[in-house]
């Protein structure tokens, strides 16, 4: 029977956000040491659950070390990295001689105060420990589809396995697939990884797996895998555009049991497919006026109009409190609006006033100067809750980050004749309708729903929508990447 060392270190880092991500952010999302890494993940629908369920079903002994995850946000404070490395490497030093494999749940786009490549740094240190002890142990890592993959990650791992769907409905499945690869490696199978970075940095709105260019590149990768039994797997990684690092961008990775030259030729083919469909990866967005004009021209039908605000894409790291769309929308005088804003200060005011109270609030745009200005909203406090909810889509994009139970902190619902607004104390990406349903809000019955996302909302919201329009606003997850003050993307392409 096999013994596997297990750890998780997951964060998607936005270089342009002013607030750093400290240890407290991990403790607020997932911070599990030792046996808690099993107890708090097994059965929760996350990638960790996928690995653990597979490992235990095969009778492996799992040695849990530390599993940490935080919501996308600013650069990670070095203290958090030290805590992870201290716990993990103490366990590795102690257990190295008895383990048959190492399994890691990573993101692939983690940046700290002092490292542009946290995952590469961790993997290199693992390799150094194993080499010092004269051990050959396979190291398998799960990556997010939005990973910015470095050569160091590839050189210091045995096999990397990335999500294939965006929204990330296959995150748990990917960990299962990676665990099966680890089983093969522990049984003596050899693979070589071939990595191919590209110069293309695509915004999140341009990398949904059901649209070009991802659709064609992913389909071509699956055809290659099916045709060549030497190929263990091909990763198509869209990259995460808001990490200002040299390795930012679209990349490809092939794990092969056969000749490296053939694997490299396959990656050349995939780059050609990407380039043939590249224009769709830089989508154009509407002004609010244009979106409303198009919405007004639609025939009558059931379901709301989705007004997508990718520049305040909570799943991409932004604060979730931008008012650049909601404010002007309210100013039009339209009604039937549903929106969610992260505003703990406003939640406390609602709690103090109590359910049923009439209240005037200044909501939104309090975290930084990049996401509009606070707007005045007068209405009735309809609901106050602890903000906890269960996901309705158990394999949703959100489950890939936190499992199937969510906590948006103390929350309040305020309403007037124009809008119903959910106010939260913790930012929560709109990836599951349970977020609104749990608070008594029915987006299905709205005329307009403001959605702070890029692609990750689609599995939840598209089925209820009459139409969907992407609206260009000024936030730090803008799809117009040339607006951002990059310093390290030498030779990269940010637009058509």
Language-model features: locations:
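Active-site histidine-anchored catalytic micro-motif
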Residues: 5, 9-11, 18, 78-85, ...
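N-terminal amphipathic/basic leader segments beginning at the initiator methionine
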Residues: 1-57
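Low-complexity, highly charged intrinsically disordered N-terminal segments
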Residues: 52-80, 84-92
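Internal, active-site/partner-interface "lid" segment
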Residues: 186-215
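Extended hydrophobic packing segments that form well-structured cores
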Residues: 45, 64, 275, 392-496
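Short, solvent-exposed amphipathic alpha-helical segments in soluble enzyme
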Residues: 21-23, 120, 268-272, 321-333, ...
């Amino acid at each position: 029977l096999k013994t596997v060392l297990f750890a998780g270190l997951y964060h998607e880092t936005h270089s342009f956000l002013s607030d750093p991500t400290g240890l407290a952010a991990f403790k607020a999302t997932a911070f599990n040491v030792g046996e808690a890494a099993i107890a708090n993940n097994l059965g929760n629908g996350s990638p960790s659950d996928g690995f653990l369920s597979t490992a235990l079903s095969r009778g492996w002994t799992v040695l849990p070390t530390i599993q940490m995850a935080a919501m996308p946000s600013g650069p990670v404070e070095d203290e958090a990295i030290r805590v992870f490395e201290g716990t993990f490497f103490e366990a590795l030093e102690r257990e190295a001689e008895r383990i048959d494999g190492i399994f890691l749940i990573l993101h692939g786009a983690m940046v700290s105060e002092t490292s542009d490549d946290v995952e590469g740094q961790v993997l290199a240190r693992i390799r150094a420990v194993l080499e010092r002890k004269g051990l050959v142990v396979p190291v398998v890592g799960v990556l997010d589809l939005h990973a910015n993959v470095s050569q160091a990650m590839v050189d210091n791992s045995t096999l990397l396995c990335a999500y294939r769907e965006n929204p990330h409905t296959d995150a748990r499945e990917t960990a299962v697939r990676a665990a099966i690869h680890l089983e093969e490696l522990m049984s003596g199978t050899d693979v070589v990884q071939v990595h191919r970075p590209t110069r293309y940095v695509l915004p999140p709105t341009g990398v949904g797996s059901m649209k070009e260019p991802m659709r064609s590149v992913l389909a071509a990768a699956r055809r290659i895998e099916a045709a060549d039994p030497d190929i263990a797997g091909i990763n198509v990684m869209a990259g995460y555009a808001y990490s200002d690092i040299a390795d930012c961008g679209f990349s490809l990775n092939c794990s092969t049991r056969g000749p490296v030259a053939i694997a490299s030729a396959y990656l050349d083919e995939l780059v050609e497919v990407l380039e043939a469909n590249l224009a769709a990866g830089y989508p154009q967005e509407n002004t609010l006026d244009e979106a409303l004009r198009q919405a007004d021209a639609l025939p009558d039908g059931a379901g709301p109009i989705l007004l997508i605000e990718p520049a305040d894409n909570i799943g991409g790291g932004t604060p979730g409190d931008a008012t650049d769309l909601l404010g002007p929308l309210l100013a039009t005088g339209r009604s039937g609006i549903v929106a969610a804003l992260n505003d703990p200060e406003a939640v406390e005011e609602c709690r103090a006033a109590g359910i049923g109270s009439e209240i005037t609030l200044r909501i939104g745009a309090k975290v930084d100067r990049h996401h509009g200005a606070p707007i005045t909203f007068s209405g009735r406090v309809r609901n106050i809750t602890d903000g906890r909810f269960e996901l309705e889509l158990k394999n949703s994009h959100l489950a890939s980050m936190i499992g199937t139970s969510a906590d948006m902190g103390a929350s309040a619902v305020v309403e007037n004749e124009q809008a119903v607004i959910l106010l939260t104390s913790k930012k929560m990406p709109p990836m599951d309708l349970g977020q609104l349903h749990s608070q008594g809000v029915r987006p299905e019955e709205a005329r307009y729903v403001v959605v702070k996302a890029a692609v990750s909302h689609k599995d939840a919201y598209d089925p209820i929508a009459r139409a969907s329009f992407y609206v260009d606003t000024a936030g730090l997850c803008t799809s117009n990447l040339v607006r951002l003050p990059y310093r390290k993307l030498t030779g990269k392409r940010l637009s058509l």
